[in-house]
């Protein structure tokens, strides 16, 4: 069975690598030390510190596996290979809802880098799916759970 690929920019991959390093070199040793200290308290069957540290260890090891998988199966997208005015992963796009003055700015990223609170939307999201491949001046219909609406692409820039 083919593994899923994780589409991302080189910057996103480097961010994941830094996060992985943090888990391996800082978080993992901290948890091991907490387990060691909790063991010194004696009877493990009623040792809540030990149980909490073991739970945290499971979380940390899980995060390490997730990050390693995303890095191993990363598919790097080069936004420089796309026309300057074309929406793609690694680009920032400003759109205006047709018939209103409402403007929104989106940074199109791979799923691993999505953070809606920072305006970073996944290339797999309905909005990004509708915008990718379109150019400045295009009007685009977007289907969302809240209903459909149209936007006009005002600008496209490479995300720094």
Curated annotation (Swiss-Prot):
Pfam families: GreA_GreB, GreA_GreB_N. Keywords: Coiled coil, DNA-binding, Transcription, Transcription regulation. Residues 1-72 form a coiled coil. GO terms for molecular function: DNA binding; RNA polymerase binding. One of its GO terms (biological process) is DNA-templated transcription elongation. InterPro entries: GreA/GreB_C_sf (IPR036953), TF_GreA/GreB_CS (IPR018151), Tscrpt_elong_fac_GreA (IPR006359), Tscrpt_elong_fac_GreA/B (IPR028624), Tscrpt_elong_fac_GreA/B_C (IPR001437), Tscrpt_elong_fac_GreA/B_fam (IPR023459), Tscrpt_elong_fac_GreA/B_N (IPR022691), Tscrpt_elong_fac_GreA/B_N_sf (IPR036805). Necessary for efficient RNA polymerase transcription elongation past template-encoded arresting sites. The arresting sites in DNA have the property of trapping a certain fraction of elongating RNA polymerases that pass through, resulting in locked ternary complexes. Cleavage of the nascent transcript by cleavage factors such as GreA or GreB allows the resumption of elongation from the new 3'terminus. GreA releases sequences of 2 to 3 nucleotides. Belongs to the GreA/GreB family. NCBIfam families: greA (TIGR01462), PRK00226.1-1 (NF001260), PRK00226.1-4 (NF001263). HAMAP family: GreA_GreB (MF_00105). This is Transcription elongation factor GreA. It comes from Streptococcus thermophilus (strain ATCC BAA-491 / LMD-9).
